[in-house]
Design a protein with these regions (language model features):
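A short beta-strand-to-loop transition that corresponds to the Sensor-1 phosphate-sensing loop
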Residues: 125-127, 153-156
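Conserved catalytic/switch belt of AAA+ P-loop NTPases
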Residues: 111, 136-153
Length: 156
């Protein structure tokens, strides 16, 4: 497992929030953004990835379990799903914050219609790792989101 957060199929102890989200998704009553807050290791990223997989799989189920062998899971795990983007600090290039160029790429991402016809989804990991310029650039799209866009962002 390269990234346990992306690949986990278990989300223990959070049945209420998952049931709430599942009902919202299945009733097609999603908000455009969800802020997840809590201590590190609580499951914020796991929840965001589970929701993303379920929404992009575009199948109604009784739970949000999407098997890791399904196409949508493989595309998300390999960061190659055309309707999904993650903003996070670039550790490989020793960046300590989410850069403005990443936010610009995200805005451009949302300027195109979804490839598979459903939602375009962005996970922002983590909002408190953005500089002021990145935050301000992101604010515009959060205030006036394109149709069928969805953001999950979390803070510690």
């Amino acid at each position: 497992m390269d990234n346990p957060v992306k690949e986990t199929s278990n989300f223990i102890g959070n049945n209420n929030i998952e049931e709430f989200m599942l009902n919202s998704i299945n009733a097609n009553k999603l908000h455009h953004a969800y802020l997840l807050s809590g201590i590190k290791g609580l499951g914020k990223a796991t929840f965001a990835y589970r929701c993303t997989k379920y929404i992009l799989a575009d199948t109604l189920k009784k739970n949000m379990n999407v098997d890791n062998s399904e196409k949508v899971s493989k595309l998300i795990e390999s960061d190659s799903h055309p309707d999904f983007i993650v903003l996070k600090k670039d550790i490989e290039n020793e960046k300590s914050l989410i850069e403005i160029d990443q936010v610009r790429d995200c805005i451009n991402f949302f300027n195109h219609t979804p490839i598979f016809g459903g939602y375009k989804i962005c996970i922002i990991d983590s909002l408190d790792e953005m500089n002021i310029n990145s935050t301000n650039a992101l604010l515009k799209i959060l205030e006036e989101p394109p149709q069928n866009s969805l953001f999950f962002y979390y803070i510690s």
